[in-house]
Amino acid sequence: MGDLTLPINSGAALAIHVALSAGIVAAIIVVAAWLREKRSGARPDVPYEGGVLPAQPQQGPLNAPYFLIAALFVIFDMEAAILFAWAVAARDAGWLGLIEAAVFIGVLLLALVYLWLDGALDWVKGKRR
């Protein structure tokens, strides 16, 4: 069986990649616009939440700490990525690697306990148990 690679310079490969990516994004947008539900008489100034119209207008900013939960997720998700890399090399790391991983997990657990006691994980502020 012969060689299946084609000689191509990096600029052409980048151009092909960008063109294909833009084409896929454009196709997704066109298909989504074509498949979406057409709503006649819809008011664009009313927020749409689960198909239910709001009972009363919003009075001020919504207290939803999505960004805080997302940031905490990213921080603690990095723990999984780092520990996966450690698990791949666990045999080569030996006991010292195991101790380092245990210290790493311990520090992250202390950070989680601190955030929990500080109330950073409470969705509604002021409702302590």
UniProtKB/Swiss-Prot annotation:
Keyword check for ATP-binding, yes or no. Answer: no
Superkingdom is Bacteria
Any one GO MF term held by the record is:
NADH:ubiquinone reductase (non-electrogenic) activity
- From the UniProt record, list the reaction(s) this protein catalyses: a quinone + NADH + 5 H(+)(in) = a quinol + NAD(+) + 4 H(+)(out)
Pfam annotation, one family: Oxidored_q4
So what EC number does this one have?
A: 7.1.1.-
Query: What are the entry keywords?
Result: Cell inner membrane, Cell membrane, Membrane, NAD, Quinone, Translocase, Transmembrane, Transmembrane helix, Transport, Ubiquinone
Q: Where are the transmembrane segments?
A: 14-34, 67-87, 95-115
For this protein, the record's InterPro entries field holds: NAD(P)H_OxRDtase_bac/plastid, NADH_UbQ/plastoQ_OxRdtase_su3, NDAH_ubi_oxred_su3_sf
Subcellular location(s): the record lists: Cell inner membrane
Its GO CC terms are: NADH dehydrogenase complex; plasma membrane
Q: How does it sit in the membrane?
A: Multi-pass membrane protein
Predominant location category: membrane
Q: Which family does it belong to?
A: Belongs to the complex I subunit 3 family.
Q: How does it assemble?
A: NDH-1 is composed of 14 different subunits. Subunits NuoA, H, J, K, L, M, N constitute the membrane sector of the complex.
Q: What function does this protein fulfil?
A: NDH-1 shuttles electrons from NADH, via FMN and iron-sulfur (Fe-S) centers, to quinones in the respiratory chain. The immediate electron acceptor for the enzyme in this species is believed to be ubiquinone. Couples the redox reaction to proton translocation (for every two electrons transferred, four hydrogen ions are translocated across the cytoplasmic membrane), and thus conserves the redox energy in a proton gradient.
Among PANTHER family, the record links this protein to: NADH-QUINONE OXIDOREDUCTASE SUBUNIT A, NADH-UBIQUINONE OXIDOREDUCTASE CHAIN 3
UniProt name for this protein: NADH-quinone oxidoreductase subunit A
Q: Which gene encodes it?
A: nuoA
